Structure formats: C-alpha cells, structure tokens
C-alpha cells in the first residue's frame, strides 16, 4: 500500500506552491516594502490562488502537519510579507483578533478558525507594545490604563527569512489549477516528463529534507538556531521530494506507517485489512468520494472543471478501496471529526445511499449517542478507524441496547475545549463550552475582568469567528435588530438579557433589513451596565 496523505501532501504541496512566486505586484501608488503586508490589490491576487476554500484547506493541512518552518510554507509566508517574514507581533483585519504574537500564530489562527482569507494589516501602534514581554508586564500591573491608538507607523521587522521576488508568472493560474488538481490525487500517474523537468529547474532551490523540517519545529523558540538551519537548508535540491512522489506512485507493496498519520503513533493504528471485511463500506467507498467532492461548496469547482474527473486517472475515485478508506480515516482522526466535510459526506452516503438511517449502531450491540450533529457518526467511525478487529455498522434494532460514546471522540473534544450549541438557521446563541467552561462562567468573567482580559478576549474572538453568515459576515447583529460596533458589547447585552431570563442571539446581518446601529459610546454603556448588574447580583447574594 502506498503511503497515506500525511506523507504525500508535503511532497505534493511543494510542487503546488512553488510557482507562487508572488511578486507581490506593486501598486502604482505604493512601493512594496520588504516585511510589510500586501496591499488590498495584492491580497486579492494572492487569495484568488487559494479560492475556493478547499484550496486554502490543502495548505492548512500541510501547516498543521509540518508547522511554519516547513520550507514550502516559509516561501509562501515570504510572499505574503513582501519577502520578509516578520519576527514579532503582527496585526490583522479581524475585528476581535486584531493582533498576534507572531505571523506563524496568525496563519495557524486563520486555519484553525476557518477564516482563510483574513488579511495582515499594518499595526496602529508600535510592534514593541504588542510584544509578549510587554503584555506580561502589563498583565502583572494592578491596573492598566487604556492605550491611545495612534496613526499607523512604518513597520519595524527583524528578518527571519528573505527572498528575492520574481514577477508573477503568466501561466501562474493555470499551473496552480493543474497542481491543485493533483492534490486530489493520492498515488496517480506520474506527470508528463517535460513537466517534471520543468519542475526540477524551477524548484532547484527548495529544501525538502524532512528531518530538518522536524528539527525546525522542535526548536521554534530558539530563533538563532532556526535561522542557522534555514541557511543550511538553502540550496538543497528537490530530489528527495520527487523520489517520495515517485515512490507513492509506484510502490505497490501494502504498507502502513501509523506514525505518518498522527503525531502520536499509538493514537491511530487501524488495520485496513480487517476493514476490508466490511463489504457495505468497501463496495460503496467510491460513491462516498463522489459525495465528498460535491458538498461544502466544492461542487462549483467540479462543475466548472468536470473534465478533472475523467482526465485524472490518479484521483481518489480510482484508488483501491483500502487506500481510499485510509484517506478518509486520516481526515477524521487528524482533524476534529465533528467539523470535517469528510464526516458530513460519509454520514450522508451511509444514511441516504446505503440506507442505514439516522441512528448509528455497531456489530458489538452498541448504540452511539447523538450528543451533537455528527457525534454519533464520528463516534462509530473513530472506533472503526482505530479498531484492530472487524467492526461493522448495523441498522439499529432492539438488540442494540448499550448506549455508547467513543472516548476517542471525547478526547478530540477535550483537545479543543469548545462545544458549539445547537445551530439555528441564521442565528447563533454562542458556544456551550469554551475552554471546558460554560457560558455563565465567561459572562461572569466578562463582568468582573472586562473585555481586555486575555481569557475573555480569547472567548470573544472564538465566538465571533464561530458564526460568519449573511450579507455582512463580519458585522454583528442580534435578534432585536441591533447592530453592535464590537463583539464585547453584544456579548455584554446577551449576558445581561440571559440574567433576566431573556434570550438574545446573534443573527446574520442582511442587506435588505434595517438595524438600529449602536454607537461606540452606547456600546460602552452596555458593557458597564452588565458589569454593574453582575456586581449588584453578587453583592445581594453574599452581602
């Protein structure tokens, strides 16, 4: 068996991303300063190459697996910063995630919160003020006076990586489309010889040694060693990467390396040969792949480029069943199963096409509990992917009496510590859990510590980004048709109404609706009102 996606994606994405020599096409009115953010026009061009979202998700998988020190991602990050990856705090255009301690943290935040097209912007205050050491000193003080926002200043950066820009290739879009097409292939035919020769020339400068990538990840906090490693890596060829791809395409010996599927080797050890004995799954795995390709907005790109299905003999549809199943297991194990498009497609296929229905039961007499939209299905699939014996899904009947939730699902939930409440159409009440703590705790902390508290701001940021819907996804409207200038004021109002046994939810902002816009001054009054009411409540209880 060929190596799974974990080993394939890095090699493939090196081919995918290297042609992106961005160049950062300079606006006629503004020169590109090394280390500065891209202009709106440059970002538009940059993000066009990562649209639709499944393209951005492909790069995020590589970042999650190999970290920011991966040479391919270093190059991509250089492009986004006019050649220099800043060493220190950076700012973004996200309303409640306005700055990050590093550009790497910013990119991880975009991926983990699915805001793939958030932009880096110039900071409105000096970078030194936003540095981690300064923040620790501020937090240690008894009281913090608000910082006056100043006009944007010229960026100050220290260099971790540098690159000389090349013009945007004329064939850039075509190359990216072609290579992204290949990203859906796991072990397909080799590319045309002349194309591989071209890659060999263009990619001669790319470092690909995996042990250096891992070494860079383990020593991210040691900047000097990182820079030294980066220099040592420069000038390396892509011979190893090409050999890895070739091995994936030609190796017919069934092999499985669990360590390539998970950072914890013992956490994922499926026996694919055992799963082969599950005929309902194996015989319909190709139908699942088709379904997965058509949901979550991926149908648009496939409708426009339907020739991919017919002309790409290395696509998932042509994979042997065991390998396709391995890819699916990898997707739900390495990510949070209940929020993955893979799980949604898989669930749809088994419910609608295979006829299992909504309830989820297995051959051990267990009935998997539906504590959230995909919890029962993910509970079963995580068990199947990890199982050393044959575990089959069955249609539920009276013989399935044991309620069950996989501990593997619980461990995934604990790793993020957040739980989204039951969704309503166009509405969002908030996270049931954040950091393992309920909303009442966070409302209380908001009232006592304020919006600027580090933990409170993290809660607000996560909630804000958990719901982006409507004509204006980044604006904040509620079910009383009030529009708020910031998320803290909305959450204060929601906590206030919750304390009065009245439910107010965030609602998508629509173009054809009229809202009462809250001024910044009024929004501060809302925050203060909740703080005062909470203080009165606690004084009444304890005094």
From Swiss-Prot:
Residues 185-272 are annotated as: Disordered. One of its GO terms (biological process) is acrosome assembly. GO terms for cellular component: acrosomal membrane; acrosomal vesicle; extracellular region; nucleus. Keywords: Cytoplasmic vesicle, Phosphoprotein, Secreted, Signal. Residues 1-25 form the signal peptide. SUPFAM superfamilies: Kazal-type serine protease inhibitors. InterPro entries: Kazal_dom_sf, Proacrosin-bd. Residues 221-231 have a biased composition (Acidic residues). It is found in: Secreted; Cytoplasmic vesicle, Secretory vesicle, Acrosome. Residues 26-106, 319-427 are annotated as: Pro-ACR binding. Expression restricted to testis in normal tissue. Expressed in a wide spectrum of cancers, including bladder, breast, liver, lung and colon cancers. Residues 26-273 form a propeptide. Residues 192-220, 232-243 have a biased composition (Basic and acidic residues). Its main location: secreted. This is Acrosin-binding protein. It comes from Homo sapiens.
